[in-house]
């Protein structure tokens, strides 16, 4: 597997470069979202933040979007987010997980992130995936899966 390196901010808000191998040995909830500071993405991020105590019993949470580090820092500070946010402007990781898709809004076609979540085991193998995620009720689906 090709090592993908992305810039991001850690759970403390510090900027750093991350690679997939940094997370080896840890179970991960990897979630892809379209854009910082938009209504659905903000609700989803707050759902992760508000359930962090339960989630971290099982896995590390990592959010990924094409947004810049500056945007991620602002998003994190505005909502008090407490997990890793990765910046994927060239959509390398999004393409690896096949979540960089053609979308359509008001008849206009464009490429963007298909809201998706993956639970990965300690070796990076996908245990569960949700695609075309609807934010309402999604955090409960994740917790239910993790508690099995």
Predicted regions and their residues:
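Chalcogenol-based redox active-site neighborhoods
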Residues: 1-148
């Amino acid at each position: 597997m090709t090592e993908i390196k992305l810039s991001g901010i850690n759970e403390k808000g510090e900027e750093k470069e991350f690679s997939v191998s940094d997370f080896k040995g840890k179970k991960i909830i990897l979630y892809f979202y379209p854009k910082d500071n938009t209504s659905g993405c903000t609700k989803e991020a707050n759902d992760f933040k508000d359930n962090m105590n339960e989630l971290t019993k099982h896995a590390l949470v990592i959010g990924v979007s094409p947004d810049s580090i500056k945007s991620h820092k602002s998003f994190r500070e505005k909502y008090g987010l407490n997990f890793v946010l990765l910046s994927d402007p060239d959509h390398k990781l999004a393409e690896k997980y096949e979540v960089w898709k053609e979308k359509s809004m008001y008849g206009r076609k464009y490429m963007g992130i298909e809201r998706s979540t993956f639970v990965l085991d300690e070796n990076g193998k996908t245990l569960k995936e949700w695609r075309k995620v609807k934010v309402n009720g999604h955090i409960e689906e994740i917790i239910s899966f993790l508690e099995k």
